Each structure stands twice: as C-alpha cells, then as structure tokens.
Amino acid sequence: MKIVIADDHAVVRTGFSMILNFQEDMEVVATAADGGEAYQKVMEHKPDVLIMDLSMPPGESGLIATSKISESFPETKILILTMYDDEEYLFHVLRNGAKGYILKNAPDEQLLLAVRTVYKGETYVDMKLTTSLVNEFVNHKHSDDVSTNDPFKILSKRELEILPLIAKGYGNKDIAEKLFVSVKTVEAHKTHIMTKLDLKSKPELVEYALKKKLLDF
C-alpha cells in the first residue's frame, strides 16, 4: 500500500517512514509538513493511507485538512496521529472524515495494526480510548439538530473576521497583528464568540466554522 505522512516535525516523518518502509506491504511515497502540503501530496500520489498529525502550523491544521482531503479524495483513508488522548478530539476527527486515531506514543506494532486496519476501510481507535465512547459517537453521529434560532446571526463584524482566523490556527498575537488591534481585544472577541455560539473548545469552533463554510482552502 502507498502511504503519505504529514507531520510538522521532520524527526517524526523520518522515524515513521523507517518503520513503515521496513514492512513488505507498505511504502511511504511522500511526506508533508502541514495540511496544505498534505493535500498536494495526496493529489499527486493518490495514496491508500494518509497518516496525519492533528496539530500542525497555522493555516492548514490537521482537522481542517482532514475534512478537505476526505471530501476530495475519499479513496484515501486518513489515520490521525496525535498526542491528545481526549475523546472530544476523537469525535471531531471521525466526524470530519478520518478512519483512525492513534497516539504518537503508541508502540510500533499498534501503528502497523492501525495502518492496516484503516487500509481495509475499517475504523481504528487507539486502545487508550474506550469502545463505549466510539459506540456513543456512532449512535449520535447523524442526530445533529439544526437550530432555527441561529446565534451566528448575532456575531459582530469583527467577530466574523476573527472566527475563521481562530479556526485556521492563528494565535491571538497573529490575529491582532493581522487586524491591527490589541491582543486583549482579540481575547475579548474570542470569549464573546465562544459564549454567543455556545462553544466549549477550539475543536468545536473549528467544526462550526467548517459547517458555516467560513474557511478558504
């Protein structure tokens, strides 16, 4: 099978490439340092599996790239590689098209099992995350209700400018410089956005921005 690895750390890309290329049934055909490059490599090589870090530089995070790649190249199975052993992140990446979720500290045997599992079209979740959580997600995956009273309509013009920048991974300082405002102003708007939209975490904000088509790729 053909594999692409996307991670912003060169040592991770090199280490995982060595592990996978040692297997007779696996070949790493390309690597990428961010989500945008991952998209280009997938488009170029049409790999069977994309192993992608969830946290990469601003602009093309793993979560955003997952949604984009899974929609454009459904034949490529995405395995998320991350440090987050939090079911909240798991739910978001599965909802956005990933087929697997594995922690960076997982043993080599588990990584190989994960790759082979998603290659077959099956879902793989790191052993540290329980089966009950996955079952709960599957049962409620298609039950999202769309509210008739959309809080999006009450966001201010400035909040509408800041929301997609946060979702793309820009930090408060970067946003402040981009919009010529203070960091404290950005922090205040960020708090207002989370409150108005009833969002509890950044992954929820990213998913919301994707649903509202606020992100340009």
Swiss-Prot record:
Keyword Transcription tagged: yes
PTM section of the record: Phosphorylated by NreB.
Pfam family, one: GerE
Residue ranges of DNA binding: 172-191
InterPro entries: CheY-like_superfamily, Sig_transdc_resp-reg_C-effctor, Sig_transdc_resp-reg_receiver, Tscrpt_reg_LuxR_C, WalR-like
UniProt xrefs under Gene3D superfamilies: 3.40.50.2300
Keywords: Activator, Cytoplasm, DNA-binding, Phosphoprotein, Transcription, Transcription regulation, Two-component regulatory system
HTH luxR-type domain residues: 148-213
Post-translational modification 4-aspartylphosphate, affected residues: 53
Subcellular location: Cytoplasm
GO molecular-function terms, A-Z: DNA binding
GO cellular component entries: cytoplasm
Residues covered by the Response regulatory domain: 2-119
GO biological process, one term: phosphorelay signal transduction system
Function: Member of the two-component regulatory system NreB/NreC involved in the control of dissimilatory nitrate/nitrite reduction in response to oxygen. Phosphorylated NreC binds to a GC-rich palindromic sequence at the promoters of the nitrate (narGHJI) and nitrite (nir) reductase operons, as well as the putative nitrate transporter gene narT, and activates their expression.
Xref: PANTHER family: TRANSCRIPTIONAL REGULATORY PROTEIN YDFI, TWO-COMPONENT RESPONSE REGULATOR
Name of the protein this chain belongs to: Oxygen regulatory protein NreC
